[in-house]
Amino acid sequence: MNGKLIVFEGVEGCGKTTQMHFCSQWLESLNISVVLTREPGGTELGKDLRGLLLSKSANKPISEITELLLYAADRAQHIEEELKPNLAMGKYILCDRYTDSTIAYQGYGRGLDMSLINNLNQIATGGLTSDITIWLDVDVEVGLSRKRGQAKLDRIEQETIAFHRRVQRGYTDLYVSYPSRIVRVDGSGSQEIVQQNIQKILQKRLFS
């Protein structure tokens, strides 16, 4: 069996992490070997980088370019240490965020140069793209209200509503640009309905 890279994307509070875990349980019930991972933080080095990137207690803010480079470093290590080896072993990797997050957050959200971002993504990934990306689409205000009701907000979650709306626009543009790779799922319904829709998509795209 060939390995597959299935990525879950979306704005804060879209439910991607929850749905990813539900998908893992479903795939394992089909006797498929599954690996759960995330960016940033999918390796030991990545965990340290995640702390730097998401901590809201830093004495000095991280510059936008530094932020971009830290995400790229996390991704490069993640691919070499986790993604490539597990794909080679035929495993299904479920990844919480990948390259589209960088385009949406650092490109659209921060307004950084898109050619720079694309070049860094290419260097970090070596051209490794997802087999399918599930974009959980929810209204920005709905997603942020979910996050506020769950836990303390990290540095990114505390950004302005205008920032998060730009991020959402980025995901919308990516969906339009890459229809063969990115599938939109309405994330506003119940967890059960959303999961059913995701399973139908994966059945069609990966198993038919």
Indicate where each model-derived feature is located.
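Pre-Walker A (Motif I) flank of P-loop NTPase domains
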Residues: 2-5
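Hydrophobic anchor at the beta1->P-loop junction of P-loop NTPases
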Residues: 8
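Walker A (P-loop) phosphate-binding loop of P-loop NTPases
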Residues: 13
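Conserved lysine of the Walker
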Residues: 16
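Hydrophobic positions on the alpha1 helix immediately C-terminal to the Walker A/P-loop
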Residues: 19
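A glycine- and Lys/Arg-enriched "phosphate-lid" helix/loop adjacent to the NTP-binding pocket
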Residues: 97, 101-169
